[in-house]
């Protein structure tokens, strides 16, 4: 037997916010902490601010994003490169 495909996970509060905004004519930014929620076709065209651990990053949802997770589009880590403190390249004597 083959395995049954499970439904995509979407947080209930996020789904309620999407439905409420779809009823209105106006577009507004939807704020969420749910990075594990899947992107549904009902979310296309909305701007969702996703939490990255420090702040909310606004992401505009387009068609190719459907089926993926919200957290995939917001990086959580910031890379800082380490520069040498000395500017000269000559060896010290």
Curated annotation (Swiss-Prot):
Keywords: Chloroplast, Plastid, Ribonucleoprotein, Ribosomal protein, RNA-binding, rRNA-binding. Signal peptide: none annotated. The keyword Ribosomal protein applies. It is found in: Plastid, Chloroplast. GO terms for cellular component: chloroplast; mitochondrial small ribosomal subunit. HAMAP family: Ribosomal_uS19. Protein S19 forms a complex with S13 that binds strongly to the 16S ribosomal RNA. GO terms for biological process: ribosomal small subunit assembly; translation. GO terms for molecular function: rRNA binding; structural constituent of ribosome. Belongs to the universal ribosomal protein uS19 family. It comes from the Eukaryota. This is Small ribosomal subunit protein uS19c. InterPro entries: Ribosomal_uS19, Ribosomal_uS19_bac-type, Ribosomal_uS19_CS, Ribosomal_uS19_SF. PANTHER family: RIBOSOMAL PROTEIN S19P FAMILY MEMBER, SMALL RIBOSOMAL SUBUNIT PROTEIN US19M. The lineage of its organism: Eukaryota, Viridiplantae, Streptophyta, Embryophyta, Tracheophyta.
């Amino acid at each position: 037997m083959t395995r049954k495909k499970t439904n995509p996970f979407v947080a209930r509060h996020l789904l309620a916010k999407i439905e409420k905004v779809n009823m209105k004519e106006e577009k507004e930014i939807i704020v969420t902490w749910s990075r594990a929620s899947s992107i549904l076709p009902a979310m296309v065209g909305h701007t969702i601010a996703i939490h990255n651990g420090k702040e909310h990053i606004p992401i505009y949802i387009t068609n190719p994003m459907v089926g993926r997770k919200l957290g995939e589009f917001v990086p959580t880590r910031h890379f800082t490169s380490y520069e040498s403190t000395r500017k000269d390249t000559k060896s010290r004597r």
